[in-house]
Structure formats: C-alpha cells, structure tokens
C-alpha cells in the first residue's frame, strides 16, 4: 500500500515486486533501507528521523553496489548495451526539523566549485510523513497515517513527562484508540525501546 500511495498506482499482486536488499532493523513496521524492483524500476525507500543532507551521497554508494550485483560483469565488455533498472530514491522523513511536504536533495549540492551543469546527479525525494503533512499520501496508506499519529503523541507527552513514561503512555493510548493497535500490542516492549532510542537520537 505504501508503494501504491507514493506512486498513485493500484498494484495488488505481491509477486510483481522483487525485493533486492534489506538492511538494518524493522522499526515501527516500516523496513529501513528497502530496495525493490517494480516494472523495471529500482526503488530505494529509506526512513529518517533526523534531517540528513548527505542522503544523495549515501544513496550513490548504495545504488552502485546494487548495480554491481545485478549486472553480469562480463557483459560490460560486449558491444551490446547492458540495460539496468531506472533508480528512484524516496526518503520518508519524520524528524522535528521543519521541512515542506515534499522536497529534493541533490548530489550536486555537495560538489565543490561546481560550474555549469553537473556531470553526475542523484536526486532524493524527501516526503514529510509527520502528522499534518502529505494528507493525500496518508489517506492512501493508513499505516503511515497511524504511524505519524503515534510519533506525534510521543513528542507531545515527552514535552511534559519523562521520555520513558511518555512513550508508554502514547503506546497505551494508541492501542485503546485503535491506532496501530495490533502492531503495538504484539510488539509493545520492542516499540517502547526503539521509540526511546529514536527520540534520543533525534535530540542529539
């Protein structure tokens, strides 16, 4: 549903999607660093709780590594053009730094003494998934909407009480109100630990 919401599509067959790489842990039911191929396009989805202008450079290293895995190295020396999936880079951002609903980070912003058009570019589309942002996206992906509601409650309660208590209060309240209820019930302790870790990291 997240892919369909982002791309305004209606894919229903999971076999159409080929997972390429999974790294890091599952946080709040959303996989970090998820790479997959759909319709000859390669998508890299990442979740960030802090603003990071270096994402294009990170993704450059990542996509080069993925292409090396996908391509037969011997074919690079042939006269036949080696086709590769077109890359798409999406970051789901829910940090406290204020940004617009949709923005772009460009690799060329990191180039020193750039003159003229860059000879190499990589663009990361950053989608703000905090509560109150990207209403259309949230409407088409209920899990993302509920995740934003949960994060907003953690931040709200953390302003008035110790973080540990704030997270537990937010989890219990969301379960009562049917917000990510099944996931939070099944993974309560892990969610509390990871939420405290993520919030502390956000404040660094």
Where in this protein do the model-derived segments appear?
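Elongated, amphipathic alpha-helical interaction scaffolds
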Residues: 1-204
């Amino acid at each position: 549903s997240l892919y369909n919401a982002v791309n305004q599509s209606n894919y229903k067959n999971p076999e159409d999607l080929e997972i390429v790489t999974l790294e890091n842990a599952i946080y709040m039911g959303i996989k970090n660093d998820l790479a997959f191929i759909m319709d000859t396009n390669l998508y890299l989805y990442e979740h960030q709780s802090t603003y990071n202008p270096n994402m294009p450079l990170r993704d450059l290293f990542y996509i080069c590594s993925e292409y090396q895995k996908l391509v037969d190295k011997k074919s690079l020396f042939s006269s036949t053009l080696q086709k590769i999936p077109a890359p798409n880079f999406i970051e789901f951002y829910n940090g406290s730094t204020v940004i617009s609903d949709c923005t772009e980070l460009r690799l060329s912003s990191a180039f020193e003494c750039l003159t003229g058009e860059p000879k190499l570019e990589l663009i990361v589309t950053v989608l703000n998934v905090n509560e109150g942002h990207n209403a259309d996206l949230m409407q088409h992906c209920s899990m993302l909407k509920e995740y934003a509601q949960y994060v907003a409650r953690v931040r709200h309660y953390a302003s008035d009480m110790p973080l540990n208590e704030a997270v537990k209060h937010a989890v219990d309240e969301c379960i009562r109100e049917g917000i990510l209820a099944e996931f939070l019930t099944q993974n309560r302790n892990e969610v509390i630990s990871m939420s405290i870790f993520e919030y502390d990291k956000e404040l660094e």
